[in-house]
Amino acid sequence: MSTQATGPSSTSGRRSNSTVRRGPPPSKKPVQSENGSVNGNTSKPNSPPPQPQSQAPSNGERTVKKLRLSKALTIPEGTTVFDACRRMAARRVDACLLTDSSALLSGIVTDKDVATRVIAEGLRPDQTLVSKVMTRNPIFVTSDSLALEALQKMVQGKFRHLPVVENGEVIALLDITKCLYDAISRMEKAAEQGSALAAAVEGVEKQWGSGYSAPYAFIETLRERMFKPALSTIITDNSKVALVAPSDPVSVAAKRMRDLRVNSVIISTGNKISGILTSKDILMRVVAQNLSPELTLVEKVMTPNPECASLETTILDALHTMHDGKFLHLPIIDKDGSAAACVDVLQITHAAISMVENSSGAVNDMANTMMQKFWDSALALEPPDDSDTQSEMSAMMHHSDIGKLSSYPSLGLGNSFSFKFEDLKGRVHRFTSGAENLEELMGIVMQRIGSDNNNVEQRPQIIYEDDEGDKVLITSDSDLVGAVTLARSTGQKVLRLHLDFTESTRSLSSETTQLKKGDSRDRGSGWVSWRGGVVVTGAVVLTSIAIVVYLKRSKN
């Protein structure tokens, strides 16, 4: 399998033979990218990049198309960063592919790019195009490429996302973490049953002959080297850990990520860890919610009391913790409870494999054979039905029965949203309010129209229009949540509300949540405002008076 990389490769080792290395501008420190170029601003080649030529798989070898692939979110490269983040949040993904005016793949942007290239640089997401910060001409694979080779390349290169192309079109996005979780689960289960070791031994014996001495001792050595070492063996004194205070703004956290080239920061109070903030949190909880990184404090959007591991925790236990919790970053504490490091699943897995591959001679060759056997076993694992629709945080909520995960809140899409309504004088008000509290929303509305929120009789009914054109009353917190969820799913930046002050609407039962569709004339009357009610009532009164006068004159 060959891959494409027309821009400079990242310092993480992601490169191909066609890579052209270019030095960064002297005036600006390069920002490491996940896929392809360093700064994401390399020029596009004049001619179309060559399609990667896939190695023909032999019988029995799995291809990329048989891996757990996710449907790729593809947007035009002229989209703003804010809109891209909003769409990623709606899809609960942390990467999207970009296309040019010819609908061809031109780049990829990830949560790390948003944090380190936009927020850390002080750029405004609503005024910055993704084409300015994306990684151009990303490396990709064809759907018939060897799965094992693709996975090993991603682990060695330490990158997560890989576009999958079939017949010249992007069909999916490969997220290595999902495959790693499968591998971890499979290897742990197989190790307990002994089947993986037996299969590996069988493969070694076929290749090296049954006369190889002490295979059991070799296997034990392999297990000792790969699974049993403590995290302290892969964490050096120079390990980078980004620390911020709870009162620091998100912009400061993003700059720490950029400067240390990490994807997360630890929030510490004194010497104790009180939270963690990742680049995905910045995308989902800050940018997608249109919050100001300079004014939003870290403590408002961090994950409090994260699960931690000690330096004595084994590599296997650390992987198991992250696998069970479906999260990607794990803070490491020393014996005093202070933050020693923060590792991600790719770092740990890469370190574990490196321990095996750093062996010498025949031991190294057989170790590689063993690793391939383990990968093959992992690839044969059937994924859960709903795996591709879960994010790392939503999965934790689905596994709420695991007590140690109770400290992690649902990532969600934030607890606020933008609303808009027109008051009695025809003025339009736009504001941000909690997306789960109707009382809070009503209070803001009443304040904007200059009425007393404590006077229930003066409160209007709040109505919105759903995706089918029906007029729906918001009478409870759950109604509000449903309205906001619908707005987000349809890509709306703001939910337009309609206020109804009429007595007929106010007398409706609170259990009534939807008004049926009428004809076009009735549809207009369904949005009757207070002013419209006065006009209609006045017309009825005047008509009645006119009839009375006419009857009196006729009688006379």
Swiss-Prot record:
Keyword field contains DNA repair: no
Protein keywords: Acetylation, CBS domain, Membrane, Repeat, Transmembrane, Transmembrane helix
Positions of the UniProt region annotated as Disordered: 1-63
Topology of the protein relative to the lipid bilayer: Single-pass membrane protein
PB1 domain: residues covered: 414-502
Places the protein is found: Membrane
Any one cellular-component term (Gene Ontology): membrane
Transport recorded as keyword: no
Stored SMART domains: CBS, PB1
Modified residues (N-acetylserine): 2
Superkingdom field: Eukaryota
Biased composition (Polar residues): 1-20, 30-44
Protein name per UniProt: CBS domain-containing protein CBSCBSPB3
Species assigned in the record: Arabidopsis thaliana
Lineage: Eukaryota, Viridiplantae, Streptophyta, Embryophyta, Tracheophyta
